[in-house]
Amino acid sequence: MAAKPPLTLYLAAPRGFCAGVDRAIKIVEMALEKWGAPVYVRHEIVHNKFVVDGLRDKGAVFVEELEECPDDRPVIFSAHGVPKSVPAAAEARQMVYVDATCPLVSKVHIEAQRHAEAGLQMIMIGHKGHPETVGTMGQLPEGEVLLVETVEDVAQVEVRDPERLAFVTQTTLSVDDTKDIVAALQARFPAIVGPHKEDICYATTNRQEAVKEVAPKADALLVVGAPNSSNSRRLVEVGAKNGCSYAQLVQRAENIDWRALEGIQSIAITAGASAPELLVNEVIDAFRDRYEVTVELVETAVERVEFKVPRVLRTA
């Protein structure tokens, strides 16, 4: 049998689950323990098919709208956050609901409301249609929050009063792209108020920093994550921008395009914030089957963040 070719595998850290995702999954599991199945979940709890399928097997029912849920079963709101109208509708129907919105997203919601109460018009930097953007914009009446996605959008945006503006951002954006958009906003509207640093969360920032470290070392980068995961897609972009000629998103090992990887001597691997470590290990094992793998851990930060689950699930 021919000897396997050698391969250096740079494993980025931090990678995978963040504290908000961990908490959201725990909320669904604890709700199923407390109330039994079915427990309804509005929108995928986190953007990962493997996680969602696992929870579905345990009795979670995933729906897109509250109207699809019966009044007499608990409903959980996803980690991405929801517009204010959603809990209001649940209360009107006297439903039991648990909000699994990531606390770092909730912080952005509070910020947006605080600025609006101070009479400032809100601008949101985010991706149109992403559930987090929809949720944050939905903290204020329709039309009150202006969305910008690119530097080009900043030139087009029409505001009521350039002296009375504030901005917030989606938590899962590219750190570098967002800096450029913020700079464009500040150049056009010098009086604009924003957070001390962008609202991009610690986990998004850390995962992008780790990719910047591994991307130039490797012939290729694989990001384990789902196609609808904003933070995972940003990791692919960051890899491509930082010197990695082949950067690809894979949901799991079976999605690896081996032909595209022919002749590589090194690979970098990371995972989006909603991808379980199990899927990363599956990808590493697939490389071990084909190569003589030497794993090098590249760690750029250590994360110790933990979020408590809501009180309703902590009590018997």
Curated annotation (Swiss-Prot):
Annotated (2E)-4-hydroxy-3-methylbut-2-enyl diphosphate binding sites: H47, H80, H130, T171, S229, S230, N231, S274
HAMAP family referenced in this protein's UniProt entry, alphabetically: IspH (MF_00191)
Cofactor binding: number and manner: Binds 1 [4Fe-4S] cluster per subunit.
The protein's Enzyme Commission number: 1.17.7.4
The keyword Transmembrane belongs to this UniProt entry's keyword annotation: no
Catalytic activity: isopentenyl diphosphate + 2 oxidized [2Fe-2S]-[ferredoxin] + H2O = (2E)-4-hydroxy-3-methylbut-2-enyl diphosphate + 2 reduced [2Fe-2S]-[ferredoxin] + 2 H(+); dimethylallyl diphosphate + 2 oxidized [2Fe-2S]-[ferredoxin] + H2O = (2E)-4-hydroxy-3-methylbut-2-enyl diphosphate + 2 reduced [2Fe-2S]-[ferredoxin] + 2 H(+)
Gene name in the database record: ispH
Protein's name according to its UniProt entry: 4-hydroxy-3-methylbut-2-enyl diphosphate reductase
Function field: Catalyzes the conversion of 1-hydroxy-2-methyl-2-(E)-butenyl 4-diphosphate (HMBPP) into a mixture of isopentenyl diphosphate (IPP) and dimethylallyl diphosphate (DMAPP). Acts in the terminal step of the DOXP/MEP pathway for isoprenoid precursor biosynthesis.
Named cofactor requirement(s): [4Fe-4S] cluster
Binding-site positions, isopentenyl diphosphate: H47, H80, H130, S229, S230, N231, S274
Family: Belongs to the IspH family.
PANTHER family xrefs: 4-HYDROXY-3-METHYLBUT-2-ENYL DIPHOSPHATE REDUCTASE
Entry keyword set: 4Fe-4S, Iron, Iron-sulfur, Isoprene biosynthesis, Metal-binding, Oxidoreductase
